[in-house]
């Protein structure tokens, strides 16, 4: 991975690395956390199963653009669902999952199915804890942490 090479050339240990993203970027951050073993992940109001995203037309477009058709895409469930990726790569990175309770779409279409599916993950042997951090911010909905809040939290994670 290019990112892993850059981190190593900067003489940074993966254990001292935090990958951060919100929404679809949170999904990608979790996937990168699988590839960068030892790094921590902070994901905010993230998609955990892209195929269950509220904006299904966007998902359809990605599947058609990247895979030509849905049938081909279904051969790679680990590219759309983080639990499937955990199972395929036998690894769960340390994840801090921020969820706004006021984002009903994130809770009903992402968090609840994720928690149900993760219960089926019995054979994954390299497992780090996932901390779900619930907050209640009515006006924000799906919007993530502010830049200041995110930076503060990232430093807290690095200090742990």
Language-model-derived ranges and their functions:
Residues 21-31:
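Glycine-rich nucleophile elbow surrounding the catalytic serine of serine-hydrolase chemistry
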Residues 34-70:
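Hydrolase active-site cap/lid region
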Residues 11-23:
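Alpha/beta-hydrolase fold nucleophile elbow
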Residues 15-16, 39, 93:
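Short coil/turn segments at beta-strand junctions that form active-site/ligand-binding loops
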Residues 23, 47, 101-103:
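Residue-level signal for short, function-critical loop segments
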Residues 58-133, 142, 151-159:
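The feature captures the conserved acid-bearing segment of alpha/beta-hydrolase catalytic domains
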Residues 1-12:
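Alpha/beta-hydrolase active-site loop
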Residues 20, 44, 97-100:
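Short hydrophobic segments within beta-strands
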């Amino acid at each position: 991975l290019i990112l892993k090479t850059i981190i190593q050339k900067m003489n940074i240990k993966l254990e001292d690395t935090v990958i951060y993203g919100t929404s679809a970027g949170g999904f990608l951050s979790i996937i990168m956390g699988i590839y960068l073993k030892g790094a921590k992940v902070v994901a905010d109001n993230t998609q955990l199963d892209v195929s269950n995203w509220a904006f299904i037309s966007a998902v359809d477009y990605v599947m058609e653009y990247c895979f030509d058709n849905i049938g081909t895409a279904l051969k790679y469930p680990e590219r759309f669902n983080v639990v499937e990726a955990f199972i395929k790569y036998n690894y769960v990175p340390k994840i801090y999952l921020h969820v706004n309770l006021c984002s009903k779409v994130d809770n009903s279409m992402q968090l609840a199915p994720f928690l149900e599916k993760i219960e089926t993950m019995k054979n994954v042997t390299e497992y780090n804890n996932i901390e779900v951090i619930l907050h209640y911010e009515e006006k924000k909905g799906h919007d993530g942490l502010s830049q200041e809040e995110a930076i503060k939290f990232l430093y807290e994670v690095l200090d742990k």
